[in-house]
Amino acid sequence: MEDEGFVDDDFIDDTAREFVGRYGIASLAVLREHAAIAEAAGDYLLAQMWREVVEAAERMLT
């Protein structure tokens, strides 16, 4: 994601780790909801960031 130039990988991983630590497997649903809310509000960059966090959380949980 760092290549795209808007949020660095450490932030994505740290955020995913925080959600996984707090919510466990349920973090995926919580994070997907954040992405959906951002997209519904028209904030596509924020929605993309949340989707990246979902992917990082999925990697941590597998």
Located regions from the model:
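Long, non-catalytic architectural segments outside compact domain cores
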Residues: 1-41, 45, 52, 59-62
